[in-house]
Amino acid sequence: MEKPAASTEPQGSRPALGRESVQVPDDQDFRSFRSECEAEVGWNLTYSKAGVSVWVQAVEMDRTLHKIKCRMECCDVPAETLYDVLHDIEYRKKWDSNVIETFDIARLTVNADVGYYSWRCPKPLKNRDVITLRSWLPMGADYIIMNYSVKHPKYPPRKDLVRAVSIQTGYLIQSTGPKSCVITYLAQVDPKGSLPKWVVNKSSQFLAPKAMKKMYKACIKYPEWKQKHQPHFKPWLHPEQSPLPSLALSELSVQHADSLENIDESAVTESREERAGGAGGEGSDDDTSLT
């Protein structure tokens, strides 16, 4: 089996905001991401309840750029199960009720690929989509998955969706025992457009905690689901299983936010059904789709 490894290019960490060319993250990039996930200085705690905590970057509260960090303690979920759930694109379609469409496009290396993801936003905002370069790396008993936006010539922005930009988004999964772990989600995203304050507040106070809890429920049900759906197919662990075509990095370019259309939704008010249900998108907490 080919061993997934980070790029060994002899260069320093590339700041997410200053990235000018498409490159597969190296070991230093993974270490930098881990350090930011574990950092406390400069973050404001906005939510802490039932093992889930949410922070926002203090200096970004009133700007277009949104930076959020969520952490959840997962009892009865091994780190490797959570890692599988985040990778398994077919299972994500079952548990992620906000997803509109998601698919892998091409393989770059044994631990990097390019993919598409579109999702429902709280009504009446326009829905978003993104093309990202995703990379992953096991680090002992821990795991990191992270991504940033790229441009692919065959997948330009669509008229019915707003193309968002992931400056850097990812997960740090830390094992705390044979059947427990802690996951930290860190996102630095430009959703493209001037969003109303209620969206920013709702994301940190409700949508992010709800998404983490839904992920936890999905992890509990994953082993049973996977036994019925290609139990041995895990290309993120066994790259030789990947059916994806190979793609050269030269085919991609960095997706800069300033090159995309800016949508002003700052005056949009929350819909009546969103206020009543408190939902992000149209999904519910019904877990019947996970069977």
From Swiss-Prot:
Keywords: Acetylation, Cell projection, Cilium, Cytoplasm, Flagellum, Lipid transport, Lipid-binding, Membrane, Phosphoprotein, Transport. The modification Phosphoserine is found at S253, S259, S284, S289. Pfam families: START (PF01852). InterPro entries: STARD10_START, START-like_dom_sf, START_lipid-bd_dom, START_lipid_transfer. It is found in: Cell projection, Cilium, Flagellum; Cytoplasm; Membrane. GO terms for biological process: bile acid secretion; lipid transport; positive regulation of peroxisome proliferator activated receptor signaling pathway. The modification N6-succinyllysine is found at K94, K197, K202. Transmembrane segments: none annotated. GO terms for molecular function: lipid binding. SUPFAM superfamilies: Bet v1-like (SSF55961). The modification N-acetylmethionine is found at M1. This is START domain-containing protein 10.
